[in-house]
Amino acid sequence: MAEHRRITRTCTLDELRPELAEAIRAHAQRQHWTHFEADVLACCETTTENIVINVFDAMLNGSAAPLTYLALIATPQRLIWASSTGGETASAASALYTAMRLKIFTPKSSSGIAFDIYAQMDGTGQKAGGRLKLDSGPEARQFCEEVHRATNLLIQPSEKKPRRKWFGR
């Protein structure tokens, strides 16, 4: 099992690593978003360093890259993310909050905060899922709060379902 050291920092789109910012801007252009930068509620970047690498896993899955970079951007309607591993080109994706199942939690198996996402990706008809990980510091928690606020605004009071009563209680 690999051990990781994660560092998350809040930043602006212009303060992201250049390859991540470029991937996000290219994604926004493909989606025909004209003023998405004005809609940014929060932005963060996480650097993950592999401290101990499982050699067998690295041979099978190619997970031996020492550094991985992740950028997350929260807007009022969607979550946008980009990642790059090692010296590879960054890739970006996004999804509307209304088209995703999003769970933000602290995994038992590792320290930090995780975003479990299952969503229909913007620009495709495909649904995909995955886990994005941040550290457990105050800047990561602040970003999670912004996402939580944005998603709560989309839930109408009538959409909140009452808890089920079990066994007639």
Residue ranges and their predicted role:
Residues V52-A114:
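Phosphoinositide-binding peripheral membrane targeting modules
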Residues M1-L72:
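Anionic N-terminal interaction surfaces
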Residues S91, Y118-A119, G129, T151:
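Cysteine protease-like catalytic core of ubiquitin/ubiquitin-like
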Residues I113-D122:
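Short polybasic amphipathic segments
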